């Protein structure tokens, strides 16, 4: 197979949703169809000892939530699929945001009983901003939920995107009979013992079946006819432009509607996209020379070996193990001899990969999130990845002073992952951590204890707002007040931590010569 054919066979997507909509369960079932796993662990069944493949970290298995992005790869038909299962919890939205920089499409999972929820809306807006095509899977049809038309209206009105139902449910909850496939004009029954039923051109079953006597069936057929006659036409160009979302109904937990979704996804999802450089030029995936960028760093995927993996999205050309590449930030060449593919925490050596693939590079501290790696004599760097402004701040120290070495190593590695942000006071060197949400602190504390054997003491600093300084040379010590703390971030940039909005405005009025700015 040529490099061009290999690249065109890649499908790389993220799954986004509000917590508990069924995102991780859908991921598991897709892996089952890809033959990547034999048995799906369910999120709810924590007592059974089975855990979701994508929830590989100990804290995830204990809590039944995803707090880090996982990468899973499998082959399906003639396609090579990369799934990025993102943190569902809003406190980890920064990790999710960066993950969305590395995909070509997204699957939005919606709980049929709850519709569009806050985290779904937030992540959808990121996809929309980036022009990422979105596929929608409306989940849990075997439970009572909102009516299908109500859900479609909610998607269209809340998200300002057109919908095209690829299938249509016959009932829901206890009366859930199955789904009508629009393209095949078949009804797939929910019960295993039933076989496919076929509709003729007049929307009638081609064979006798007791379901025709049920009002649920006649209502579903009426709705389906209305969708066929008055709904949107399917337009693949609109899908690729992020203006239309194909909608699939099903139940991930019951493994129903998942394979038909996967079949449609590989038919319609885009092949790998290029990426824009800082020089505002696009690098095509078919550019012969290799290029890629680091979008995530994960420490301790194997706690026994204290390893660190840098996740790289290949943007162009082909990667070969042992090749020489240049890290643009340092302008230094390096030979990549240790590279890996993923099934959550299971790893396998990668000798060859192409544009669209996600691979892991063993990291001894060389890489940072957002780094560009290139082959040949290429000189560009890709655009920086976003960083969020934290809203919560805690002082942190080791409970046992004899554990300082492990304490500092743990902080260094977890900060480099981008899971938490690091600050240090200028004169006392007190470490302050910043987070978007409280759960980040809880996970940090848990991982320090379990992965680095360090108990930490955390104490709020009473500050809620971080503002970076453009003109650092104009700062004077007296500008730190009882309502603000002057600190440095991990890149030694000056940052003021303010008590509240009032304190921020007071500072800006008192010191107009100091130019402050925030991140995302």
Curated annotation (Swiss-Prot):
GO terms for biological process: regulation of translational termination. NCBIfam families: prfC, PRK00741.1, small_GTP. This is Peptide chain release factor 3. GO terms for cellular component: cytosol. Gene3D superfamilies: P-loop containing nucleotide triphosphate hydrolases (3.40.50.300), Peptide chain release factor 3, domain III (3.30.70.3280), Translation factors (2.40.30.10). It is found in: Cytoplasm. Coiled coil: none annotated. GTP binds at residues 17-24, 85-89, 139-142. Disulfide bonds: none annotated. The keyword NADP does not apply. Residues 8-273 form the tr-type G domain. Keywords: Cytoplasm, GTP-binding, Nucleotide-binding, Protein biosynthesis. Belongs to the TRAFAC class translation factor GTPase superfamily. Classic translation factor GTPase family. PrfC subfamily. InterPro entries: EF-G-like_DII, EFG_III/V, G_TR_CS, P-loop_NTPase, PrfC, RF3_C, RF3_dom_3_sf, RF3_GTP-bd. It holds the Pfam family EF-G_D2. It comes from the Bacteria. HAMAP family: Rel_fac_3.
């Amino acid at each position: 197979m040529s490099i061009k054919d290999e690249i065109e066979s890649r499908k790389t997507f993220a799954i986004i949703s509000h917590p508990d909509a069924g995102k991780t369960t859908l991921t598991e079932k897709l892996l089952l169809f890809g033959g990547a796993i034999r048995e799906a662990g369910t999120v709810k069944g924590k007592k059974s000892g089975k855990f979701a493949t994508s929830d590989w970290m100990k804290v995830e298995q204990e809590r039944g939530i995803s707090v880090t992005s996982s990468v899973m790869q499998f082959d399906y038909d003639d396609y090579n699929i990369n799934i990025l299962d993102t943190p569902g919890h809003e406190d980890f939205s920064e990790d999710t945001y960066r993950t969305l920089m590395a995909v070509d499409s997204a699957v939005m999972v919606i709980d049929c009983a709850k519709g569009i929820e806050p985290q779904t809306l937030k992540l959808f807006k990121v996809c929309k901003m980036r022009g990422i095509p979105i596929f929608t899977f409306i989940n849990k049809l075997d439970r009572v939920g909102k009516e299908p038309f109500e859900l479609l209206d909610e998607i269209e009105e809340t998200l300002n995107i057109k919908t095209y139902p690829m299938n249509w449910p016959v009932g829901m909850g206890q009366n859930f009979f199955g789904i009508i496939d629009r393209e095949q004009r078949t009804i797939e029954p929910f019960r295993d013992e039933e076989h496919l039923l076929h509709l003729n051109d007049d929307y009638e079953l081609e064979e006798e079946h007791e379901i025709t006597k049920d009002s649920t069936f006649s209502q579903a057929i009426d709705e389906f006819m209305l969708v066929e006659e008055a709904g949107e036409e399917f337009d693949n160009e609109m899908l690729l432009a992020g203006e239309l979302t194909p909608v699939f109904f099903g139940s991930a937990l019951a493994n129903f509607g998942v394979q038909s979704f996967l079949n449609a996804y590989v038919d319609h999802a885009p092949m790998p996209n290029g990426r824009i450089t800082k020089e505002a030029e696009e690098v095509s995936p078919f550019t012969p020379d290799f290029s890629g960028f680091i979008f995530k760093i994960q420490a301790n995927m194997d706690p026994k070996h204290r390893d660190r993996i840098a996740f790289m999205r290949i943007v162009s050309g082909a990667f070969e193990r042992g090749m020489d590449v240049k890290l643009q930030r340092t302008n230094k060449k390096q030979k990549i001899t240790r590279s890996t593919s993923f099934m959550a925490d299971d790893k396998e050596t990668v000798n060859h990969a192409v544009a669209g693939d996600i691979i892991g590079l063993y990291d001894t501290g060389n890489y940072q999130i957002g780094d560009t790696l290139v082959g040949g004599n290429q000189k560009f760097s890709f655009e920086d990845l976003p960083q969020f402004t934290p809203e919560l701040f805690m002082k942190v120290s080791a409970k046992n002073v004899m554990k300082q070495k492990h304490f500092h190593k743990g902080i260094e590695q977890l900060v480099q992952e981008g899971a938490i942000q690091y600050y240090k006071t200028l004169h006392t060197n007190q470490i302050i951590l910043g987070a978007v949400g409280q759960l980040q602190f809880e996970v940090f504390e848990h991982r320090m204890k379990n992965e680095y054997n360090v108990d930490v003491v955390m104490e709020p600093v009473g500050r809620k707002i971080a503002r970076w300084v453009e003109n650092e040379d104009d700062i004077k010590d007296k500008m730190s007040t009882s309502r603000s703390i002057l600190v440095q971030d991990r890149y030694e940039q000056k940052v003021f931590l303010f008590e509240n909005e009032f304190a921020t405005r007071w500072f800006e009025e008192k010191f107009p010569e100091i130019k402050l700015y925030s991140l995302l």
